[in-house]
UniProtKB/Swiss-Prot annotation:
May cause loosening and extension of plant cell walls by disrupting non-covalent bonding between cellulose microfibrils and matrix glucans. No enzymatic activity has been found. May be required for rapid internodal elongation in deepwater rice during submergence. PROSITE patterns: EXPANSIN_CBD, EXPANSIN_EG45. CDD domains: DPBB_EXPB_N. It is a peripheral membrane protein. InterPro entries: Expan_Lol_pI, Expansin/allergen_DPBB_dom, Expansin_CBD, Expansin_CBD_sf, LolPI, RlpA-like_DPBB, RlpA-like_sf. It comes from the Eukaryota. Disulfide bonds join 85-114, 117-187, 122-128. The gene is EXPB11. Residues 82-192 form the Expansin-like EG45 domain. This is Expansin-B11.
Length: 292
């Protein structure tokens, strides 16, 4: 009987020790989850974009894919300061500098295409320069003309005008639907590292962050978070370029946080302790890293 009791006590001690050292103890302990707060930043309602008339012609250039193009917003504007990627007013500021586009579903990819860069050029209108303009996907064009072909760029007035000959930007914007050529290119944010903007709805039990300015692929396939003293745990794409993570233990998350990014092509980059222990909602934290 004494040996049996000793064996039972030894097993209990081993189980207790394993729970103490397991990463599950950080924030994934199986207990009743704390209700997740409703984030303050909601995905905007995506409406059809209406600055187009007419029908596209068809021209295909070797090495490039064909797409349609229109523009939305002000003629010299940034398209939208909301958008289905969550970049908000950043689209009109450096390094985006209004050179953006809303992508059709094949480009937006349910939000996974946010941040991807493309060269777009036109040759089918007298106002076209034939020189490509580089745009970043920052919004979704969900229906209407955006579903007419395999791909469609609803560009800001600024990026549409960038494809025009000098002095002919207004004429090009007035052309209606353009048939363009496009190709995926690496994003290049010279002198800018990846930034992490903490959502206003984040709190000690719930963390959500907008990730922007990734060189290379520009878009992300996966994001993992590591709490202080813990292991990596996958985050969940909330919408657009926002990723979320919440405690399932009823205990506050333990900052500082490190974030591990996996790009569309599988390249991995780690921003160690990029979110400090004293982090606050609504604040942007700039990392010291970017894809080379």
């Amino acid at each position: 009987m004494a040996k049996s009791c000793t064996l039972v006590l030894l097993l209990v001690a081993l189980v207790g020790l394993s729970l103490l050292v397991s990463p599950i103890a950080c924030s994934r302990k199986l207990s009743k989850p704390k209700p997740k707060p409703k984030p303050s930043m909601k995905k905007p309602v995506v409406r059809a974009h209406n600055n187009y008339t007419g029908s596209p012609s068809v021209t295909v250039t070797t090495g490039w894919a064909a797409a349609g193009a229109t523009y939305y917003g002000a003629p010299n504007g940034d398209g939208s300061d909301g958008g289905a990627c969550g970049y908000q007013t950043a689209v009109g500021q450096r390094p985006f500098s209004s050179m953006i586009a809303a992508g059709s579903p094949s480009l937006y990819k349910g939000g996974k295409g946010c941040g991807a860069c493309y060269e777009v050029k036109c040759t089918t209108n007298a106002a076209c320069s034939g020189q490509p303009a580089t745009v970043v996907i920052t919004d979704e064009c969900p229906g209407g003309i955006c579903l007419a072909g395999a791909a469609h760029f609803d560009m800001s007035g600024t990026s549409m005008g960038a494809m025009a000959k000098p002095g002919m930007a207004d004429k090009l914007r007035a052309a209606g639907i353009l048939q363009v050529q496009y190709r995926r290119v690496p994003c290049k944010y010279s002198g800018v590292n990846i930034a992490f903007r903490v959502d206003q709805g984040a709190n000690p039990f719930y963390f959500e962050v907008l990730i922007e300015f990734e060189d290379g692929d520009g878009d992300l396939n996966a994001v993992d978070l590591m709490e202080a003293g813990c292991g990596w745990t996958p985050m969940v794409q909330n919408w657009g370029a926002l990723w979320r993570y919440n405690s399932n233990t009823g205990k506050a998350l333990k900052a500082p946080f490190s974030l591990r990014l996996t790009s569309d092509s599988g390249k991995v980059l780690v921003a160690n302790n990029v979110i400090p222990a004293s982090w606050k909602p609504g604040v942007t934290y700039r990392s010291l890293v970017n894809y080379s």
